[in-house]
């Protein structure tokens, strides 16, 4: 499943729903909410992560990661 939440990140209901999937492609524009959400998705591991500076000379960036459920 592919998710691209708002800057505020994921809600608890969405995180519960995501746990039904083996793989998640997570796109984020906010490192703080991304880290918070990853903490709640601790039963997943990061298989790949890339950071894109799509807006040079600003503080904005995009994080794209592939998460896979541990022990699936």
Range-by-range predicted roles:
Residues 1-72:
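Rossmann-like S-adenosyl-L-methionine
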């Amino acid at each position: 499943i592919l998710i691209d939440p708002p800057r505020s990140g994921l809600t608890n209901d969405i995180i519960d729903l995501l746990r039904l999937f083996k793989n998640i492609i997570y796109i984020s524009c906010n490192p703080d909410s991304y880290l918070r959400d990853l903490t709640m998705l601790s039963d997943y591991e990061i298989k790949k992560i890339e950071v894109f500076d799509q807006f040079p000379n600003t503080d904005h960036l995009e994080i794209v990661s592939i998460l896979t459920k541990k022990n699936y």
